[in-house]
């Protein structure tokens, strides 16, 4: 009997010990991560650019472009029966909107001038042996070694109004069309206008600068009517780029969609303010009280800066998180030169552990450019209701759903815009 009791006690003790072990919480792997968001856009001096063909007397050429408030257009076309003269607006270009924000339209020839590139000694208009229609080849005249200036060489030139007419049409939205007419078939000196270039830019950028030496591209355009080098320069320095706005992050359970749900309407948690105006505050506040979120916060101060601000090209935001196996991370940051677009992972975020191992490396391929569906999209970088020009809550409501952007406009590849790296600490 005593032996049976001893055996019973030993078995009971073993069962209790086993039971206690089964009730212990399993310790999941955890890790600390540094998340870095980098703006990898290449800054561009010009918003857009293009070329137009030669314009014989009695004919015309047109080109169109999108431009928002604060934009200017510049152009240059050679006065062919000269050594190095070209027509263009002032070096600051032509403002496309007036001080009231209304589009400028109509005949803008009054803003056109005949410029001397200062690169070749002038000869009498139409008769000079070193002018394109008379010379044996390009670049044959005597170097002037001067600077760009309004023509003032004591030769007689036909009035600009008898040679060229430039008209500006506003086609709705932010679309404009420029038409250049060659009227010189009835002038005292009929002349072709050579193939030219145009560019859209802000008030800090110039196609050329009065009083300075002409670029090699401007020299070829003004002396030989060859726009290829100037066009190459403009193509390399034109295009879309954008800051990113302060954003939010959340570490959460796999079943949680903390920021948005694909193909569903915005739930009013603050995504609209983030995606339209770059304001993460409402969304950050909402995340703090959302079930299934381990931790959340705002990234808003570029690394090396002392104050919050937008993320400009070559700069980074960074923040540190601690998570355990099973946790996911979501982020969102506005593409500022848009109406309501933002970069984020899928609506469920991405896992911070794979097979029990913490991830580390470039996760940019998991990012997508999303449309919040809250404001009607305008031409990227030119919309007058985008934050740079319109201010908060200025666009037309879309009343749509959150979806991968698909609006017919062209956007850069994700890897050309943003880079997100998660580094194990």
Where are these regions (language model features)?
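Active-site-proximal cofactor/substrate-binding loop regions of enzyme domains
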Residues: 180
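Structured domain cores in non-transmembrane regions
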Residues: 29-105, 173-175, 184-347
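N-terminal secretory signal peptides that target proteins for export/translocation
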Residues: 1-2
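Bacterial Sec-dependent N-terminal signal peptides
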Residues: 13, 17-32
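Mature, soluble, non-transmembrane domains
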Residues: 58-60, 68-171, 301-425
């Amino acid at each position: 009997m005593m032996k049976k009791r001893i055996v019973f006690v030993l078995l009971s003790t073993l069962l209790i010990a086993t039971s206690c072990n089964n009730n212990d919480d399993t310790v999941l792997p955890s890790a600390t991560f540094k998340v870095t968001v980098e703006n990898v856009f290449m800054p561009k001096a010009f918003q857009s650019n293009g070329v137009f063909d030669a314009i014989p007397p009695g004919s015309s050429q047109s080109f169109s472009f999108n431009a928002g408030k604060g934009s200017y257009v510049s152009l240059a076309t050679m006065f062919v029966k000269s050594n190095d003269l070209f027509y263009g607006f002032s070096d600051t270009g032509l403002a496309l909107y007036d001080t009231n924000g209304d589009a400028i339209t109509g005949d803008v020839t009054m803003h056109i001038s005949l410029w001397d590139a200062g690169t070749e000694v002038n000869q009498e208009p139409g008769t000079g042996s070193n002018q394109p229609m008379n010379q044996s080849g390009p670049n044959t005249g005597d170097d002037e070694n001067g600077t760009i200036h309004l023509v003032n060489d004591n030769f007689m030139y036909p009035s600009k109004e008898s040679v060229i007419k430039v008209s500006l049409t506003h086609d709705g939205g932010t679309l404009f069309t420029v038409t250049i007419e060659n009227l010189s078939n009835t002038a005292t000196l009929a002349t072709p206008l050579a193939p030219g270039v145009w560019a859209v830019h802000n008030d800090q950028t110039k196609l050329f600068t009065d009083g300075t030496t002409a670029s090699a591209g401007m020299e070829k355009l003004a002396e030989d009517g060859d726009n290829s080098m100037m066009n190459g320069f403009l193509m390399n320095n034109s295009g879309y780029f954008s800051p990113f706005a302060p954003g939010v992050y959340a570490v959460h359970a796999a079943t949680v969609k903390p920021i948005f749900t694909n193909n569903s309407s915005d739930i009013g948690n603050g995504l609209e303010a983030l995606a339209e105006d770059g304001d993460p505050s409402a969304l950050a506040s909402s995340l703090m009280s959302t079930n299934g979120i381990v931790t959340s916060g705002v990234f808003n101060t570029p690394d090396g800066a002392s104050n919050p601000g937008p993320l400009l090209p070559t700069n980074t935001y960074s923040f540190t998180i601690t998570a355990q196996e099973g946790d996911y991370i979501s982020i969102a940051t506005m593409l500022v030169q848009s109406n309501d677009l933002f970069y984020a992972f899928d609506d469920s975020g991405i896992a911070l552990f794979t097979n029990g191992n913490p991830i580390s490396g470039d996760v940019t391929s998991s990012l997508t450019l999303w449309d919040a569906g809250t404001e009607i999209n305008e031409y990227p970088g030119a919309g007058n209701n985008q934050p740079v020009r319109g201010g908060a809550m200025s666009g037309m409501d879309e009343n749509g759903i959150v979806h991968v952007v698909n609006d017919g406009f062209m956007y850069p590849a994700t890897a050309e815009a943003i880079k997100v790296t998660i580094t194990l600490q």
